[in-house]
Amino acid sequence: MIDFELKQKIDEAKKKFEDIIKVFHPENKRKELEELEKQMGDSDFWSDQRKAREISQKAQRIRKIIDDMKDIEAKFEDLDAAIELSDEDQSFVETIKEMVEEIEKKVKTFELELILNGKFDASNAYLTIHPGAGGTESQDWASMLLRMYMRWAERKGFDVQIVDYQPGEEAGIKSAMIYIKGDYAYGYLKYERGVHRLVRISPFDANKRRHTSFASVNVIPEIDDDIDIEINPEDLRIDTYRASGAGGQYVNKTESAVRITHIPTGIVVTCQTERSQLQNKETALKVLKARLYQLELEKRQKQLEEIQGELKDISWGNQIRSYVFQPYTMVKDHRTNVETGNIDAVMDGEIDIFIESELIHFAGIRNKQ
């Protein structure tokens, strides 16, 4: 027989799953999937390849969510069977505890899958970091953030590649861009965009004073080549230079680095990690396309804010998180108020506590609009 505390955990997991299902409307999703599969069966389905890909990807996402829902339902059935057996055999209690932990994780993942339903949420991501004012201290902070995000991506099983890396003169970085490849990479990271604040006793200060430093993080999705963003070659200035970087497995030092300036907007994109100038140019153009698309989205968002009134809480330009090393240790997200004292784990990439709370928080804001 299971104790009260374990029974309470089971009841909470069941209620959470039931609440999610109410929002999900499984029957509506099944009908939507049937309609999409019907379209995919048409003889002229691939005549418009861009639209066909969008439909195929949407069907794939819905199919996965339905399959995951069925899997959780089956897990609950197995759990109920184990609970019945535990009335006669106490050895099942430990098995039940393990089953409940697995179900809780699956329910949380399922909830996030439903939240990650934006147009580009399933895309790969480009993440850029720039230090704020403050010289070496800020540049060192930017490099700490770079490592944090790379460790997070590796923990997720994502592929990570440094696209651009500009080392600081004394320590740290002047800027860096990484490409993160994996399912929902952009969806997970999109709310990491903003200003990150560090408070610590600076190792670069001989007087051991406490310093506050800032670094900005920007995240954009990898945009499909078929997206309607026109780039006029006459609007581009393309420069080449010798690559420089951190070395190791991430940066291929060659003389083929490319810098592209989009003259009308002033956007500058650099790439130095591919093996040839042509490959670097192609990657830089892809990033430029994504940046221009982001710029267009921001213009539309600004228009919506003017009509609806600005929701300051979801402004990505504000300071979003503080990382305090001294006089105490704490990492706090200023939007969700989620915090932890285990700053070493956070800097080693354990940031899902913040990412998951961000997604749930902003999903709630969208639902109220």
From Swiss-Prot:
Coiled coil: none annotated. SUPFAM superfamilies: Release factor (SSF75620). Pfam families: PCRF, RF-1. GO terms for cellular component: cytoplasm. Gene3D superfamilies: 3.30.160.20, 3.30.70.1660, Release factor. GO terms for molecular function: translation release factor activity, codon specific. Belongs to the prokaryotic/mitochondrial release factor family. This is Peptide chain release factor 2. The lineage of its organism: Bacteria, Thermotogati, Thermotogota, Thermotogae, Thermotogales.
